[in-house]
Amino acid sequence: MTARKYYEKMKVACQNDIKQSRCRADIMMKSPRANVALRIAMAALTSLVTIQWHSASVSAGEYTGNDPVVVAQAERALSAFERWRLRGDTVAYLEYIEVRSETAAQVAIRTGMLPEEVQNAWAEGDLGGQRAALAALTQVGVPYKRYTEEEGVSFDCSGLTGYAWGRAGVDLPRSSRSQDRSANRVDPENARVGDLTWYPGHIMLYLGVDSLVVHSPVRGRTVEYGTLSEDRAGWVRFADPLTSE
C-alpha cells in the first residue's frame, strides 16, 4: 500500500478522534491513533522522495529561485489550513499536515538536507511560524524590487517577511531593522521555522534547520530559498514575532 493510499484509509478513522482538537502544533494532537497514523504515513512519504536527495540538491550559499512544485504545495497547504481554521474541518487539518510535510521534503531535497529533519523541524514549530514560512514559499520566483510588497509581482526583503507573517495574522513594521527590533530575540539553538533571520541591511525567514532560509535578496534575483554560506551564517541573529516585546 502506498503512503498516499494509507493516508486516505486513515482519514475516516482519525476524524472522530480529533474532532474536538484545536492543535497549536502536531505534537499536541489529542488522538494517539491520529498521531501514529500520520507519523507512519509521513515516514513513508519521506522514503519515497529521499532517493532523489543527492542528485537534486544545491550547495551552501546557493539558492533555488524557480520551484513551481514547492510554490503549488505551499499554497495548497495554506488553503487546507484555512479550511480547518474557518470551518473546523478536521480532514482539512490532516491534509494540511500531509502537504506541509511534502513541501518540507521537497525543500530538503533541493537544498541537500535530510527530508525527515526538515519535516520534524516544521512539525515542532508554532502554527504561526509554519504558515509564515509556507506563505513566503508561495512567492518563490517573484522578482525583487525595492520598497515593494505585492503578492505575485515583487518584494524587497522586508516586504516578503511582512507579507508572510501577515498571512499568519501578524502585522510587522516595514523596514528590516524595525521588524527585527519589534520581535523577541531568540538564541540560534532555539530558533524555529518562521523566525525572522536578520543581519545588517537584510532580513529573511528561517526554515527551521541549520542555515536554511527563504528571502528576497537583491535586484536581479527573485524570492528564493537555500542555505546561507558559512561566513554569512555567522552574522545572523534570530527573532520571534509571536513573542514580540
Q: Which ranges hold each PLM region?
A:
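N-terminal secretory signal peptides that target proteins for export/translocation
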Residues: 1-32
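Intrinsically disordered, low-complexity
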Residues: 24-143, 230-245
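...with weaker cross-activation on analogous glycine-rich loops/strands in unrelated enzymes
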Residues: 61, 170-229
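Catalytic cysteine-centered active-site loop
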Residues: 140-193
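Coiled-coil-like amphipathic alpha-helices with heptad-repeat character
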Residues: 17-19, 34, 172, 176
